[in-house]
Structures are given as C-alpha cells and as structure tokens.
C-alpha cells in the first residue's frame, strides 16, 4: 500500500483547518512553503501542556518534571527525524533564523580576518544575512556562489572556483524555498570538507518533502523549522557533537545548555514531537516495502517509519507536481521558473514559481485568494535569486506549494483558476 487518494483523504481528516469553508468550498492550502497546517494531535499536545504540565524546567515537582520529560522525548524524536547519532546533537530555538544568528556568532569567534565564508545566490536570507553580519564584525570575506539562471540550479563550477583554502564555512540550502531546486547536498558537503571548511545546511524547505540523514550527508550543522513540517513554530538545530563542543557559546553564565537560551517553548516542543510521530505513522500506514515484506505496523521503529513515511510523501507529492507542471505548461503567457524538464523532477521539490503575462504576482495571488485558493507571492526572502532573475520590480513570482495533504481535485481547481487568470492577463497585455 502506498500513499494515494484514499489514504490522503484519511490523513486530511486529521487536519481541522482543512475543513474550513470559503464561499461554500473548502479552502485549498497551496501555501505550504510558507508554513503548513497541523494535525489534531499537534493541537492536542500543545493544549495538553497548558492544561496539565505548564511549568518551567528544573523544579522538584511533577509539572516541572513533565516539562523536562517533554524536551528529552522531543530531542529523541528530532534525532530520529534527522538521523542524528544522539539526541544531545539536537537544539531548540525560537526559529531557524535566530538559531543561525546564534551559531554564526559562535563560529565567527573562532575565525580571523581574511578567513572566508561561502554562501549561495539560491538561499533564503536567513542563511545569508547572519554570515554577512559576522563577517562585517570580524573582518571576514563572504563569497557568493551564483545560480544558473536557465534552470535556477547552483553553478557548481562557480562553487569550485570560489571554494579555497581560506574558506572556513560553507552555508547553503538543501532546497530553494523560492523555485524548488534541490541541491546535491552530500556532494557539496564533501567538497567543502575537502577544502577544510565546516558546512551549514538550511533544510527548512526540504523537511516536509523528503528524508534527512545528517550522517549520510555528513554535514556539521543543519537547521529546520517545525512549522514547515506540520508542527508549531519551533526552530531546530542539529550540530555535530565534536563541533559543538569546541565552539564558544554566547549564553548566561548559569545556563546548563550552551546553545539554548532562556526558557524553552515547551508547548511548541511537545507539538513538534507530535508532528514527527504523525510523519512516522504515515510510514507505518503507507510505507514502502523492504525486500519481500512490508515494513508496516505499530511496532515499526520510529526512525525506519520516518524514512518510509517521507518516501511515501515524496512519491505522492511529485505525482501531483507533474499534474500541476503539465497544466501550467499549457497556459498562455505563463512561465514556470526553475527545473522544467520532467526527466529532472527528482532534482526539485513540488514547489512552483510562476509568472503570468499581464498580471503581477500579487494580483494573481489576490484573485486566487478570493476564490479560496491560498498561495504566496513575492521573493520569500530569496532576494538574491529573484533579483538575478530580473523579477524584483515585477513583484517576484507567484509560488504554488504542494504538500501531502493536497489533492488532485485541488490541483485541477487551481489550474482552472490559473487558466482564467492567464487568458485575462494575455488579453490585457495585448490591449496595452
């Protein structure tokens, strides 16, 4: 059994927000790259924390013990999701951006003027601006690897040209939140390590779409955000144990953890654990087979279940994306940015960046929103890429993001609406 329409219908029943009506129709959430909806179990865990366990950590009483236990158990769940060696390599924070500013400061304290940091022109600013800030403070040099504009992939020749013996850290994304390009993560890590550099991978956009194994890709750091994979607003940092141990930490003196500042978001962390268990349950219910036997059932190891679940999600989502891409290709005046060759769809996520002739992305998103279809428009903090594509003055792109709770009928509904907008935009452009 794989994830298909009937299974998705069952899963959709676990998401209260997916039952919301707009104009007599359910709201179609095609805004996943900006944040996902959450299943009931996540809501219940957040609520239950306030109802029965609301206390700070470290106390000698039951509710404080419960808060401590929530964090310990959630670290283990995240370690399973990311493939970490130990839960101690998992750190929680307000969001990926805050965690990256924190870690960038710690790493920069070990560097000297003239040392170099490599970033990319495909990335979200949260994995660019922190490195620019510490470079300014410390007299470091930041080099930017450019994208190939024909397919919005990373220019690997430029990567090699800018990687040098002076490079101390390479920061890049697993996948582009703007156009969906998947980078060759393990290969980039290998090249960076051969040059003697640390690696810092932004997996925020990738996390809801496929497997993560920090040991397999061999990265030193990886960050993601639970609200992108059906959880609350919690930032997550993986750091290789031996690297974390040698970094200076910026913290209050009595704090026992070196990279978690202040009181943690216990309710959000409880919800994050629930979101990971939800993904593991997808693996148990709809996961792939191993050899001749199905790896399925209540007793499946969580790490194995997560791999099976993310594999099932990836296969289902990309089936929907093919349907969407084929439909967009037939629209008059429409342009899909990024990898468009169906034979290369394995190199992308199910996120479409679109422009329509004669209509701004904001106008298109507004029109879709009025008929109950949620999308995003703009640059999504991937300013460098949108500028290089020459789309900033036009308002960026219209972004359509598929996740596993979306359906074929929602894709068809979206395509019908886009066709109306495209034909109207072409007519306006011709008249103008």
Feature map (PLM): residue ranges:
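Pyridoxal 5′-phosphate
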Residues: 1-432
């Amino acid at each position: 059994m794989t994830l298909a329409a009937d299974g998705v219908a069952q899963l959709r029943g676990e998401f209260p927000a997916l039952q919301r009506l707009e104009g007599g129709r359910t709201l179609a959430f095609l805004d996943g790259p900006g944040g996902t909806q959450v299943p009931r179990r996540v809501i219940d865990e957040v609520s239950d924390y306030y109802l029965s366990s609301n206390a700070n950590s470290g106390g000698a009483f039951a509710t404080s013990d419960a808060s401590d236990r929530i964090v310990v158990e959630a670290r283990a769940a995240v370690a399973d999701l990311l493939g970490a060696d130990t839960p101690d390599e998992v750190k929680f924070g307000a969001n990926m951006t805050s965690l990256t500013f924190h870690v960038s400061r710690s790493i920069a304290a070990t560097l000297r003027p003239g040392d170099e940091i490599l970033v990319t022109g495909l990335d979200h600013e949260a994995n660019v601006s922190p490195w620019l800030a510490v470079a300014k403070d410390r007299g470091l040099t930041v080099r930017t690897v450019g994208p190939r504009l024909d397919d919005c992939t990373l220019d690997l020749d430029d990567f090699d040209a800018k990687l040098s013996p002076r490079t101390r850290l390479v920061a890049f994304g697993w996948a582009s939140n703007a156009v969906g390009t998947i980078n060759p993560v393990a290969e980039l890590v290998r090249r960076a390590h051969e040059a003697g550099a640390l690696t810092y991978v932004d997996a925020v956009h990738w996390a809801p779409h496929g497997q993560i194994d920090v040991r397999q890709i061999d990265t030193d750091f990886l960050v993601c955000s639970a609200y992108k994979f059906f959880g609350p607003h919690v930032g997550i940092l993986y750091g290789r144990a031996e690297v974390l141990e040698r970094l200076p930490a910026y913290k209050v003196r009595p704090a026992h953890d070196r990279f978690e500042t202040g009181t943690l978001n216990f309710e959000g962390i409880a919800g994050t654990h629930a979101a990971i268990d939800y993904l593991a349950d997808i693996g148990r219910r709809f996961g792939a087979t191993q050899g001749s036997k199905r790896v399925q059932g209540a007793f499946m190891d969580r790490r194995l279940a997560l791999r099976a679940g993310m594999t099932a999600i990836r296969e289902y989502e990309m089936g929907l994306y093919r349907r969407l891409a084929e439909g967009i290709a037939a629209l008059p005046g429409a342009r899909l940015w990024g990898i468009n060759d169906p034979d290369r769809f394995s190199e992308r996520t199910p996120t479409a960046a679109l422009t329509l002739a004669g209509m701004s992305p904001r106008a298109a998103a507004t029109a879709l929103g009025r008929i109950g279809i949620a999308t995003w428009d703009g640059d999504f903090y991937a300013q460098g890429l949108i500028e290089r594509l020459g789309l900033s003055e036009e308002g960026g792109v219209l972004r359509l993001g598929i996740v596993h709770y979306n359906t074929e009928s929602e894709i068809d509904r979206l395509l019908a609406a886009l066709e109306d907008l495209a034909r109207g935009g072409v007519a306006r452009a011709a008249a103008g």
